[in-house]
């Protein structure tokens, strides 16, 4: 099943993202700044059974009739529980996520990445950059963007610290967090 996530940079995004991946479902990340027409197109192509979002984006999803064929899960109503016995069987070749291209030359296209694609890339980047548990990554890019998501994946794999900015355009706040960390 495809599970779409429409959330800003936040701990809720991270929990949802890693939860979907670890559950064996396919994660489709929707940029929060997406246009109505692009939203409709991405949901038509990815065919999610569930959309994880919040009340802010529920209005956009309703306005575009995007909730007709899937279930809406409001992250604000979630109760997180420890399910340490949960261990799904993941096939390395199965699709882990669908990321859409920017569509600068034509209609955005969905790019399917397997668990092994993602794991290999994360391992290569963390090894090359020598990212460790002592590192702190100030993530100011949207997590819906492949580079922002890559930064999150690499720092989490390494056991380091991620400082995630919800407002990716608040430059003074980002500079202050760099100074603080």
Q: Across the structure, where does each feature detected by a protein language model lie?
A:
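Conserved S/T- and glycine-rich ATP-binding loop of Class I adenylate-forming
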Residues: 3, 20, 51, 95, ...
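ATP-dependent adenylate-forming carboxylate-activation enzymes
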Residues: 7, 28-44, 55-57, 160-180
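Conserved AMP-binding/adenylation subdomain of ANL enzymes
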Residues: 119-136, 144-181
